[in-house]
């Protein structure tokens, strides 16, 4: 019995030793895989992505804050604070001042928009000239047309027959509405025909 127990213990020890070897090989292989992946492991990638998103969100908030400050500054410049008005003369003076400012701003706006239109036209002309020199021409954008729409149009045309409204009218033999010129032409012959 001791031989059987010893033999069984030896087999168990052999199995344990083989399991340990397999475990070591798997650990070695996993270490090799990690070593091959390089510096950026999935955890590091996730952390880096999170940091980048936080930085981008912070930058976006900063930009929005700067834009809002710029907007407030410009509004403070442009908006004239209304004074306390005691009588009509003060009101007319404020009205005249605001009207003059409005006229100035509108004329500036018109001048700027005119310059922009001129520049756009010039840019377009130069683009056309460059394309002509290169030999490249701008292809016009085509509208998308569905195939089924054309088929439906053909079916509608076949179904819709021409309606002749004159056929429904009553025939009148009187020549009340006929022109008199036709009768005179028949009676009178041309000078050369005589």
From Swiss-Prot:
Tissue expression as described in the entry: Expression is detected only in pharyngeal muscle cells from embryos to adults.
Keywords of the record: Actin-binding, Muscle protein
Transmembrane segments: none
GO cellular component: sarcomere; troponin complex
Region (Disordered): 1-27
Compositionally biased tracts (Basic and acidic residues): 7-27
Pfam families: Troponin
Free-text disruption phenotype from the record: Worms exhibit developmental arrest at gastrulation.
Keyword field contains Lipid biosynthesis: no
One of the protein's GO biological processes: embryo development ending in birth or egg hatching
GO MF annotation list: actin binding; troponin C binding
Role of this protein: Troponin I is the inhibitory subunit of troponin, the thin filament regulatory complex which confers calcium-sensitivity to muscle actomyosin ATPase activity.
Family: Belongs to the troponin I family.
Protein name stated in the entry: Troponin I 4
Provenance organism: Caenorhabditis elegans
